[in-house]
Amino acid sequence: GTYGYPTPAVKKIESYYDVPEGVDIRGRYDAEFAKILTKDALKFVADLQREFRNHIKYALECRREAKKKYNEGALPEFDPATTYIREQEWVCAPVPPAVADRKVEITGPVDRKMVINALNSGAKVFMADFEDALSPGWENLMRGQVNLKDAVAGTISLHDKARNRVYKLNDQTAKLFVRPRGWHLPEAHILIDGEPATGCLVDFGLYFYHSYSAFRRTQGAGFGPFFYLPKMEHSREAKIWNNVFEKAEKVAGIERGSIRATVLIETLPAVFQMNEILYELKDHSVGLNCGRWDYIFSYVKTFQAHPDRLLPDRVLVGMTQHFMKSYSDLLIRTCHRRGVHAMGGMAAQIPIKEDPVANEVALELVRKDKLREVKAGHDGTWAAHPGLIPACMEIFNNNMGNASNQIDTVKREDGANITEQDLLQIPRGARTMEGLRLNTRVGIQYVAAWLTGSGSVPLYNLMEDAATAEISRVQNWQWLKYGVELNGDGLGVKVNKELFGRVVEEEMARIEKEVGTEKFKEGMYKEACKIFTRQCTSPMLDDFLTLDAYNYIVVHHPRETSKL
């Protein structure tokens, strides 16, 4: 089969998905899923795929070209060809009233209980995630679609028998944004004209098709649906999204500019394209967001062939590092100049119930970080756990008066002087054995959870998603490739394969001790260790860990589940 996935044997069975011409479903049949995978909804997805697949292939080809240039020594830069877009005065369409106030946004995967709790959390926005917080197996994706459809309809509920509790929506809920996958991820359970569908078009298309009408009536107050767009590297990728939105609006018969999206600036090339990205999405934009971990991951990836740009321990690469501060300042200036939200980054801390002292220390860190954001001019921020919402909300409320946002009040004209050198400045700090160990034990545990269906994983009192595993593996890769000296702990040890092998062995023993032998045997820790270690030691750096690990979770049903 395509991409070396097994080609299923054709056997007729009683229940199958009713599919349009050219669409073939290889995921398990389920009557609930069939309400999502209707013939019309699949036709909508297939039409998007057919119209845009060549543009998507071209955009991904351009990513490879850019990578080649960086590997030959080039640095990312502002594009001279689009100077006029950066210099002219223009603004995006006005912000829809329903989402003027986004002071605190909670993020999380699309499982049923999470969706209910997040919508009820008291945050202004819930970003329901099909991307880094979700392991994209068939069941997770399709259940997620069912959950969002029910959430928008207002009917979502859950009876937790173990706790004897019924979960349902409050009268007041957060506004729903949905984050589809990035352009590079395939959906191997749905074939269109014999090729795997583009993951994000499946995520976007199925959700939009079933929910746009109810969403605009309720949540969006005449606008919407709302989206978050991940991992873009260039404005040409934003242009494809803009065209997808316009096509969807046309098919649905809703006004142009109804659909709105916030773009995550979480790759190094994209920071030089912020004006251009907003310009492409002018009628469909509701701002940009700082995706910190992925941005650092992208810094390492972009400079994989530049030994002069080694990172210190990742815990030291905070927002106060010059290149990170420059990135967030430029993002705020750009968004406010163009009339849209500049969203702050993630607070990943999880409340530590069993240790009030440690909990207070963690909360203090969150408060400090959020205070920095609101003072810099951010309009809102992210939290991974509902327990952080009150602290974040308080900081933003106290520092913004009664305003919904700071778009008109904090212009950050000083951001006009931020240069390419500022954005690329090499971060300072030491490299330590503990840095290498932490990357290894967190990376392996994250991949193990991902392989067993969890994409959002609590580890050492932080809520981790795929971005953490990515930065962990590329940093290990970089240190190994260049044999860096661990200068931070006075031992002067150089990182090499032998040392890394020993670290992996010791960290695996530590993980087993921490999770218990039983769980260690049941979990996919050995497989995860193989994948993670291979990624850290391979001669060439893989673009995405999730792309490599995806092959392990694709399950093609041997029975044919859609009629030919």
Curated annotation (Swiss-Prot):
Active-site residues, record numbering mapped to chain: 179 (proton acceptor), 465 (proton donor)
GO BP terms: glyoxylate cycle; tricarboxylic acid cycle
Motif (Microbody targeting signal): 562-564
The name this protein goes by in its record: Malate synthase, glyoxysomal
Reaction(s) the record says it catalyses: glyoxylate + acetyl-CoA + H2O = (S)-malate + CoA + H(+)
Family according to the record: Belongs to the malate synthase family.
PROSITE patterns: MALATE_SYNTHASE (PS00510)
Compartments (UniProt record): Glyoxysome
This enzyme's EC code(s): 2.3.3.9
GO MF annotation, one: malate synthase activity
Matches recorded under PANTHER family: MALATE SYNTHASE, MALATE SYNTHASE 1-RELATED
Organism of derivation: Glycine max
Main location: other
Gene Ontology CC annotation, any one: glyoxysome
Pathway participation: Carbohydrate metabolism; glyoxylate cycle; (S)-malate from isocitrate: step 2/2
Database matches in CDD domains: malate_synt_A
Primary enzyme class: transferase
Keywords: Glyoxylate bypass, Glyoxysome, Peroxisome, Transferase, Tricarboxylic acid cycle
